[in-house]
Amino acid sequence: MNAEMRTLVEIVLRDFPSAQAIYLFGSYARGEQHTRSDIDLAVLLPVDIARAAGDLRLSDTALALAKQARRDVDLVNLRLVSTVFQNEIIHTGVLLYCSDEPARQEFEMLALSAYIKLSEERADILRAFLRTRQAYNVSQ
């Protein structure tokens, strides 16, 4: 982890000392960033703290991160984003910090299980859409 990312992790931990994990995702995680790229970070918090914290995109923490990085920073509360987004972050992101390996592994396992279940549930819907090219009033 480079010095810039280490500093950003420290800012997140200053505001959320109980953070269980922090992931870098998006263009920076893929090594495809350019001059106008934002930095995408996801923080895994204990369940009760995640609920209390809510959406972090416009939080004081996100603003402090953006000020430090001198670019936009998208900070997401990993427990509160969609199942599809959780799966994307887990599978394409880079783990920058982990203080609770069992909690991280449990979250990743549950998120993957939820994603698999969602994929199974929507498989028939997707097949019907591909067959008819209609999103509504499609009989199976």
Describe each PLM feature range:
Residues A42-P46:
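Short hydrophobic/aromatic beta-strand micro-patches
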Residues M1-A21, A29-T35, D48-Q140:
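Catalytic core of pol beta-like nucleotidyltransferases
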